[in-house]
């Protein structure tokens, strides 16, 4: 099925300036420390594969994509507009065993 309408960006969905919450700032700091410095993002158009391990069945599969992607962009100095394809998976895990897996490859 195809809908002939320009997609709305997250930025276009909200009015006014948005600020990072203290919880997001803490999350960003923790992720930046956990991500390996040696990871290299290839040049050109990219594909990202993400797998989120949630402990709640109610977690939406798409909610963590943009915050995590923005952190990857910051850590590895690339523009996420280069991502042309994404594969996203959700897995339910025990509380305390939550995780994020990712891989960025050239198309």
Range-by-range predicted roles:
Residues 1-107:
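Acidic, proline/glycine-enriched N-terminal capping motif
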């Amino acid at each position: 099925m195809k809908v002939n309408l320009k997609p709305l960006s997250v930025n276009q969905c909200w009015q006014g300036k948005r600020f990072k919450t203290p919880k997001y700032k803490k999350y960003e700091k923790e992720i930046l420390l956990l991500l390996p410095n040696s990871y290299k993002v290839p040049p050109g158009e990219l594909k990202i594969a993400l797998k989120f391990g949630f402990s709640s069945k109610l977690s939406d599969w798409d909610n963590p994509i943009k915050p995590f992607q923005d952190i990857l962009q910051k850590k590895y100095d690339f523009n996420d507009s280069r991502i042309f394809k994404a594969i996203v998976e959700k897995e339910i895990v025990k509380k305390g065993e939550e995780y994020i897996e990712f891989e960025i490859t050239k198309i």
